[in-house]
Amino acid sequence: MERITRADDRVHRPAGPWTPTVHRLLAHLHEQGFVAAPEPIALGDTLETVSFVPGVAGEYPWTEDIASEAALVTSARLLRQFHDAAASFPRSAEDDLWSQADRAPVETVVHGDFAPYNCVYDGIAAVGLIDFDTAHPGPRVWDVASAVYRFAPFTTGTVEGSTTADLAERLARAAEFCRAYALDDRSRGVLAETMIASLVAFVTTIEHEAAAGNPKFVSDLQHGHADLYRADVAYLEQHAAAITAAVA
């Protein structure tokens, strides 16, 4: 299995059947002035080459900078800028091939895994967005729900986050993310159920891909990620009404 490597200002990554479409998306983003994404450089049979996005990814455990309100707010604004730029991507039923099926209602091209670890930071400011392998057409709230789940965070475990915040703080961070993104009222009303749906879909993906022998997902399953997400689904279901009220 190919690995991600960096040489100077270029990053070499494993390519998939969807990579040509992702490269067209990345080129479109830059044409629209969204320069926070990598630029496509080359595409081979098994590897793609994109530009390196300078900064620090928000990996776990979070630093004080990544856990800050400023990092949350700038991440939300970055997501909004990405969605606005991607909305005009010229889609083609004949040429497009994404790693995931379209999700209705299609409003833009969503990132598919918007989280701190796929954002790049300069101190407390989100300045870049990477890893577009899961991009696909869909509703804006699909990405916002994933982001709120990660940034609040609404996880019950300690593997995926840093210091666990109390519910009131999580709700406040969720509301702040929605404000910074300028999420519409309809999407706010379905945010909690969309978070739950996205986690259920992710568990299904982990189990399906692990059964097919995908080494990444075999590892995820062995490390209890599916069980963690199931626990998070139960937590979200328990507090769905409070989440909906907080972000309204």
Locations of regions flagged by a protein language model:
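ATP-binding pocket architecture of kinase catalytic cores
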Residues: M1-H111, A115, D122-A125
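Short, polar/flexible loop-turn hinges at active-site or ligand-entry regions and domain interfaces
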Residues: P61-D65, H136-G138, T156-G161
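Amphipathic alpha-helical interface surfaces
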Residues: L78, D122, R140-D143, R170-R173, ...
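Alpha-helix capping at helix-to-loop junctions
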Residues: Q81-S92, P116-V120, A135, R150-G157, ...
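Catalytic activation segment of kinase domains across protein kinase-like and atypical kinase folds
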Residues: W98-S99, T108, A115-P153
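Active-site activation/catalytic loop segments of kinase-like enzymes and analogous catalytic loops
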Residues: V144-A182, S198-A212
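Short, surface-exposed acidic
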Residues: L183-E193
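ATP/Mg2+ or Mg2+-diphosphate-binding catalytic cores
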Residues: F202-A248
